[in-house]
């Protein structure tokens, strides 16, 4: 199980201090949710903040775009060499083209599926994907409660996309992490405040 702490759960008044606290910890990547209220009702980080974070942290960065038209960000992101870029399947008109654009940044490419989104229609992209992320809570900002039935979706992802790395994101507690790992999730984005941001 590889953990990825989410910067969106840090205290926004103390990002610098909380990033420094992570310097000597071992985890997969620092995870940034990019939201502009066009897909979900929240706003997180702009490009200036992302660039500042990239300058300060020694850790690789993974990005989860929860917005319409994520492609607008890719040219600027290429300068900081992200490790992963995930985009929501629900936002894409031409997913294969978008995945190619992600790879041009130097990042590995992944799709994200909301809890209600079936995965079967996306199997044709299996050879173009490095990762698949399952949202394990509704990304609505209303408590981020873990949905246990998403463990079944994790199992389906492992079958449908056997060559990709399987991620889970949303409401993940220690107990939920154990369930998800048993279902086959390899990477987990954690609600980091109680775990790392102390």
Region annotations inferred by a language model:
Residues 17-22, 69-79, 116-128, 172-188:
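Catalytic cores of alpha/beta
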Residues 6-13, 63-71, 91, 112-119, ...:
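Glycine-rich beta-to-alpha transition loops that act as phosphate-gripper elements at the mouths
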Residues 36-44, 48, 115, 121-155, ...:
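Glycine/Thr-rich beta-alpha phosphate-binding loop at enzyme active sites
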Residues 25, 56, 80, 105, ...:
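Structural motif
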Residues 85-93, 133-143, 183-198:
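Glycine-rich phosphate-binding active-site loops on the catalytic face of alpha/beta enzymes
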Residues 43-65, 101-114, 148-167:
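Alpha-helix-loop-beta-strand connector modules within alpha/beta enzyme cores
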